[in-house]
Amino acid sequence: MPRSLKKGPFVDAHLFAKVEAAVASNSRKPIKTWSRRSMILPDFVGLTISVHNGRNHVPVIVTEHMVGHKLGEFAPTRTYRGHGVDKKSKR
């Protein structure tokens, strides 16, 4: 279910502080975060945010189409290697 409009978007305070500092200094350095639950705000557009996927940090370049989504949606946590091959059908 979506979050209530009355509550507004959720962004971790430490992440928002890093984003504000990066925007103020016009920094191109990626922002490293573990906060997959934070929502992408219009202030994040154009920044590179490294989102942790459980093993390493995945760089995410934020575009206008990502606003309103969560950071974790763009850093997949599972790798799909395909289903097992049927050996009978090869004959």
UniProtKB/Swiss-Prot annotation:
Gene Ontology MF terms: rRNA binding; structural constituent of ribosome
Pfam families given in the database record: Ribosomal_S19
A single Gene Ontology CC term: cytoplasm
The keyword Ribonucleoprotein is assigned to this record = yes
Q: Name one GO biological process term.
A: ribosomal small subunit assembly
Kindly state which keywords UniProt assigns to this record, in alphabetical order: Ribonucleoprotein, Ribosomal protein, RNA-binding, rRNA-binding
**Family matches, as PANTHER family:** RIBOSOMAL PROTEIN S19P FAMILY MEMBER (PTHR11880), SMALL RIBOSOMAL SUBUNIT PROTEIN US19M (PTHR11880:SF8)
Task: Briefly state the protein's biological role.
Answer: Protein S19 forms a complex with S13 that binds strongly to the 16S ribosomal RNA.
What is the name attached to this protein's record? Small ribosomal subunit protein uS19
Name the gene.
Answer: rpsS
